[in-house]
Amino acid sequence: IDGAVQFPILFELNQGQGQGDQVKTQVAAAYKRPSEADASRWVLSSYFTSDWMPATTARTAMPLALDMAHLYAALLQGLMPLPVRPQEGLPDWIARVELAANKRREVEKTQARLIKEKQFNRKVEINAILRQLKSALEQLSR
């Protein structure tokens, strides 16, 4: 759906049936921007999601915004896993979040490699790489 519609979409996902706490709700959205190569196409970032919450949870008020772009940015801000830096625009913030996610996956792969490695000298090398990756991830997360 997101690829077909050329406007930002905020998805509300529902899980379960019936009444009460069995029904859960999650909000998901992806940042959309026009493609640099083809103006008729849109480029999607990865999806940002909220936690699953009971459907009976009280809804928060919509943020105040002067136009739809600012409203969508304010709604995305609540779903982002990292805080915004001062003077950081939404596209830069999205790029930093995606870079941090890639770095996190790289840390997990390196940790798995460290566990599988048997030779001590290779473990020392992998551990040094792991420390560098973790410090880079920490820099991105601030």
Where are these regions (language model features)?
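Short, charge/polar-rich alpha-helical segments
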Residues: 84-98
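TerminUS-proximal long segments
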Residues: 124, 139-142
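Charge-dense, low-complexity intrinsically disordered segments
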Residues: 62, 94-97, 120
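Selected N-terminal structured segments and early membrane-anchoring regions
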Residues: 1-88
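Short, charged, amphipathic alpha-helical segments
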Residues: 120-131
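Non-transmembrane amphipathic alpha-helical segments
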Residues: 96, 100-117, 133, 137-140
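Long, hydrophobic, amphipathic alpha-helical segments used as structural scaffolds
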Residues: 83-86, 118, 141
